[in-house]
Regions:
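Active-site rim beta-loop-alpha module in soluble metabolic enzymes
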Residues: 124-132, 150-191
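A cross-family phosphate/adenosyl-ligand binding-site feature
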Residues: 3, 14-82
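Glycine/threonine-rich flexible loop motifs
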Residues: 94-103
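Short, glycine-/small-residue-rich phosphate/pyrophosphate-handling segment
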Residues: 126-145
Length: 209
């Protein structure tokens, strides 16, 4: 298959590199990904401004834009080959429940709804998973499973896959579930001094202003 691969963590993130390596064993993979981390941008696009695209090779394009920009640019006017399916990930951090509304990983996947097969967003629930290689290899199997269905059986769908922190030994199979309502996220802590604000986010990473 011809696969368009993107993400929201950036073109050089561990997750996208791991799944690219795994997918390339049996498929043609074209990477169109953001230049830097774009987590939390949902399906936003760069409106009324130019977008810089850097061609690293025939199968790697780096975009100064959002994850959704990458999806639309890759599908509409960048790649000559017909794309069969769009894969977004592997994101390091879960995208479950209400989180899908602002997830850049899921937002990018939405751009592939008109393709032959439904777009697939993939996330690891842990920022440092036990075995990213296992998740990447299992993701390939799930991509092939999704694309084995007839189009009418899964039309107008977006597949959102989340891996708990598991490896080959602890894997017990897959379960298909609807999107649930997630608990209220932790209240952010804001610490002030004379020079900046420190915002302690729900993720393990602190943000400074």
């Amino acid at each position: 298959m011809n696969i368009l691969l993107t993400n929201d963590d950036g073109f050089d993130a561990e997750g996208i590199m791991a799944i690219r390596t795994a997918l390339e064993k049996n498929h043609n993979v074209y990477v169109v990904a953001p230049e830097k981390n774009c987590s939390g941008l949902s399906a936003s696009i760069s409106y009324l401004k130019e977008i810089e695209i850097r061609k690293e090779s025939e199968k790697l394009y780096i975009v100064k834009g959002t994850p959704a920009d990458c999806a639309y640019i890759g599908l509409l006017n960048l790649l000559n080959n017909e794309i069969d399916v769009l894969v977004s990930g592997i994101n390091l951090g879960a995208n479950i429940g209400n989180d899908v509304l602002y997830s850049g990983t899921v937002g990018a996947a939405l751009g592939g709804r008109k393709l032959k097969f439904p777009p697939i967003a993939i996330s690891s629930c842990e920022y440092i998973p036990k075995s990213l290689e296992f998740i990447a290899n299992k993701s390939c199997e799930l991509v092939e499973l999704v694309t084995s269905f007839k189009k009418q059986e899964i039309s107008n769908k977006v597949v959102n896959i989340n891996f708990p922190d598991i490896d080959e030994e602890s894997y017990k199979g897959i379960k298909v579930v609807p999107i649930a309502k997630r608990d209220t996220p932790p209240t952010p802590n804001i610490l002030k001094d004379n020079s900046c604000l420190l915002y302690t986010s729900p993720s393990p990473r602190d943000l400074h202003w």
